[in-house]
């Protein structure tokens, strides 16, 4: 089964004006599933706090909202679900401290030079 075969089957299902975007989403979803990208991302994030020394930094570039939500949750709360855990005194016990309070996105100039960068988001955190 080739990408052209898949495209031939699903193309009639999309409206003409949205066909390119919908096709891109379809192939992105297939790639994510086939490569098990979400599983790999979660495994890497779960082990990051174990392998980094205090003061060590992790920088992650995400390219779509599902990845970004997972990375943001882990960096803010220390877990994939985004549940903030507190100690007895009410202090947040997350293993990371955010380095950049706002996500870093490509400048307009970068996006003009490299259109594929338009969806990229960079998040940086430091091990406590």
Protein language model regions, located:
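S-adenosyl-L-methionine-dependent methyltransferase catalytic core, i.e., the SAM/SAH-binding region
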Residues: 1-128
């Amino acid at each position: 089964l080739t990408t052209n075969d898949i495209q031939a089957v699903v193309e009639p299902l999309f409206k003409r004006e949205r066909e390119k975007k919908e096709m891109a989403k379809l192939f992105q979803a297939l790639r994510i599933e086939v490569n098990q990208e979400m599983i790999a991302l979660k495994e890497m994030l779960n082990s990051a706090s174990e392998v980094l020394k205090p003061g060590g930094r992790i920088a992650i570039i995400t390219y779509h909202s599902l990845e970004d939500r997972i990375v943001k949750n882990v960096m803010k709360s220390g877990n994939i679900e985004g549940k903030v855990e507190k100690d007895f005194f009410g202090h947040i016990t997350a293993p990371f401290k955010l380095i950049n309070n706002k996500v870093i996105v490509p400048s307009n100039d970068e996006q003009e030079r490299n259109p594929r960068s338009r969806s990229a988001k960079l998040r940086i955190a430091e091990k406590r």
